[in-house]
C-alpha cells in the first residue's frame, strides 16, 4: 500500500500488509518466503526520514476528526449523485466485473453517453480526457487519472470542506453544460448516482469495454521477446503481431500489452481509441504512437 497516496507521508513510502487471521491462527502468506525475496531487493541502508514520515502520518490520522471527513464526503457524493448527465460511480457497481467494494473517498465520474452542446461545432462527444482538461484549466483541479470516459479524483483526510465543495461546484457546473444521448430516464429526471440496479446502462456501463478486462495471450516470455530482433510497424497494422514493447496508460501504469504478448484485434481497437481521445498512452519508443516495435518472425 502506497502510504504517500492518501496519507500525509513522504513520496516513496509504502507498506506491505500480511494477513494473519486464518482460522486456527497463522498467516495466509508464507512469511519466510516473503522475507527471503525482500532481502533480495531491499536496501541495507533504510531511510529513517521515510520511516519516520510513515509513523508521523499514522500519528496524525489517529488524532484527526475522521467523522467530519466522512460527513463531508457523504455530502459531496450526495450532491454529485444528483447530476443529470455526468454519473458518479456508487455502491451499485459492487459485484460487477470483479468489484468487491467501493472506496467512497475515490470520486469516479463517468462521461459516457454525454456531449457538450457547442453553438460553433454542434454536438461534441465529451470524453474523460476532455473533462480532465476542463477541470485542470478552468477550475485548477488536478484529477488523479482519466480514462476514455471517466475521471478519478482522490480525496484525503487532509482535504478541507472548502476544497471538496470546490470539486462539487466544478462538476455540477460542467454537468449543467452537457446533454445526454438516448432516453435514459435517470439522466432526464436527475435521479441519483449510478447504482446498477434500476438502470441496465448504469453500473455495468461504468466498466463495459475496459481494456483491463481483456487478456492478451503470451507467445513467449518477456525476456525472450526483449532479446529478439525487432522491427517497427504501423500501430494500426500491428494486430496479430507479438509486441516488443509495453503499452500502458499512466496513470495507473498497468500494462495493456507487454513484450512477448500477442496484440489482439480488440485490444488494438481500444488502444487506438485511447490514443485518438488524447489519453496518456505510453510505452512505445515512438512517442507519436504511430508505430510500435514488434518481434520479428524467424
Predicted regions and their residues:
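Terminal helix/beta-alpha structural elements that buttress the NAD(P)+-binding lobe
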Residues: 284-297
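Active-site PLP attachment segment
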Residues: 1-35, 42-53
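Short, contiguous, pocket-lining structural segments
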Residues: 6-8, 42-50, 65-68, 72, ...
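Short secondary-structure boundary/capping segments
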Residues: 14-17, 58, 170
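Conserved PLP-dependent catalytic core of the aminotransferase class-I/II
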Residues: 31-32, 58-96
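Conserved C-terminal alpha-helix-loop-beta "cap" of PLP-dependent enzymes
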Residues: 78-192, 196-283
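Amphipathic alpha-helix from the class-I
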Residues: 52-65, 158-162
